[in-house]
Each structure stands twice: as structure tokens, then as C-alpha cells.
């Protein structure tokens, strides 16, 4: 199944050409890494795929039946939000089922409780809360009631990474996971865990990283932007 088709993409900033006339396809199950020198347009290319930037010419066609999920360097959250609230703000049926089930535990409405239980069954969401805690634990995020505002930059990145991994877990439809430098702010143990997690995961992946060992372990396809070509 084809996820993304790119044809003859060119991007310039002023008089500087980042890349020109590049073409590629991403298919289901691909685990692809993009490598290049700094300033060669790796992150710009990801932003174009996500619709956050625009090419000067060329086409990007994204399969309408897939979900594209991005981990980048910009993390947005609401002021006062706890880690749990940030993670559980995901808009997906399994997460909605879990939110309703947790509300039902403090409700006197027996009909609401019964419906919440049925939702959990239908969405196969019973293991979701434990999996969420396990992923956060592996990334050394333990106080789930901590306010996002009070976290360090590195902690915020790790919480956002956890949210992304949980999102790919709960989305039942076809998902492309795009990751820009995911090992930043991770210690050796966390990098090793993430490497194993992504290697085992049945996910389609497009990855940018300077960690050559990590990308060699996780990805089976490596693309290089060199002399403005892919």
C-alpha cells in the first residue's frame, strides 16, 4: 500500500537551493532514515510532507486513508495541563473510551458506567492505561500529575515522544510515523529502549537523526540528501 508519493520536489530559500527535483515513494511497512549534512533540508522536507512548509515546485500526494503523525522540535500544550491530561488529550476512539471509563468510576450513573465498559470492550482499550504508564516509565517520566509548565525542555520532549508512541498504538488505521531527531534529550538507556521499541513495532517510519547507530538498527532503507539530490 502506497502512503506518500513525491515527484520532482524543489525547495529554495532566497538564493540557496536545499534540494531539487527529488522523487520518492513511501510504502506500508517501510522504515526509512534520511541523512544529510546540517542545512541540507532534512527538517524542511519533513515539514513539507506535513503541510507546515511549501515546496517551490513538485507534488506531494498523501494517501487519504492514512494517518500521519509527527514528532518534531515544537511541542504545544495548554498552560496548567498535567502530563496525564496532555497524553490523554489524544483524539482517538480508544483514548476517548478510556477517558469515559475513568469518569464513570466516580459517577453514580449506572447507565453511563455500563456504556463506558462496553466502549472499553469495543475499542480493546483495557491495556491502554498500563501501556501508557510503561512507555512513560521507560522514558523516565514518573510523576504523571506534574504540570507540563514545570517540566524542563528535555522532559517536555520525552513526554511528547511518549504521546506520539501512544498515538501510533491507539490508531487502528494505517499510520505513518515521522520523527525528527527523536533521540535528543534521551540518555543511553532510553535510546536503547526506543531503538528496540521501533525495531519491533509494526509501523511505517520516516526518521531524521544524526545517530547513525540508531538509524542503522531501526531502519532498513537509508536515503541521503547530497548535492541537492536524494
Regions found by a protein language model. Name each.
Residues 1-230:
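ABC ATP-binding cassette signature C-motif
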Amino acid at each position: 500500500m502506497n502512503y506518500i508519493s513525491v515527484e520532482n520536489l524543489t525547495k529554495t530559500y532566497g538564493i540557496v537551493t536545499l534540494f531539487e527535483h527529488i522523487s520518492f515513494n513511501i510504502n506500508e511497512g517501510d522504515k526509512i532514515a534520511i541523512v544529510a549534512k546540517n542545512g541540507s533540508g532534512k527538517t524542511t522536507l519533513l515539514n513539507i510532507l506535513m503541510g507546515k512548509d511549501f515546496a517551490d515546485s513538485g507534488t506531494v500526494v498523501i494517501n487519504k486513508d492514512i494517518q500521519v503523525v509527527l514528532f518534531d522540535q515544537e511541542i504545544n500544550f495548554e498552560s496548567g495541563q498535567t502530563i496525564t491530561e496532555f497524553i490523554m488529550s489524544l483524539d482517538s476512539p480508544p483514548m476517548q473510551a478510556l477517558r469515559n471509563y475513568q469518569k464513570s468510576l466516580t459517577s453514580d450513573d449506572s447507565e453511563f458506567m455500563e456504556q463506558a465498559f462496553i466502549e472499553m470492550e469495543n475499542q480493546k482499550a483495557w491495556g491502554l492505561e498500563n501501556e501508557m504508564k510503561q512507555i512513560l516509565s521507560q522514558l523516565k517520566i514518573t510523576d504523571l500529575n506534574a504540570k507540563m509548565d514545570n517540566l524542563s525542555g528535555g522532559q517536555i520532549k520525552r513526554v511528547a515522544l511518549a504521546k506520539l508512541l501512544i498515538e501510533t498504538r491507539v490508531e487502528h488505521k494505517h499510520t505513518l510515523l515521522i520523527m525528527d531527531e527523536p533521540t535528543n534529550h534521551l540518555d543511553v538507556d532510553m535510546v536503547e529502549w526506543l531503538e528496540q521499541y521501533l525495531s519491533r513495532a509494526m509501523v511505517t517510519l520516516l526518521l531524521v537523526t544524526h545517530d547513525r547507530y540508531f538509524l542503522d538498527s531501526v531502519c532498513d532503507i537509508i536515503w541521503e540528501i547530497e548535492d541537492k539530490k536524494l
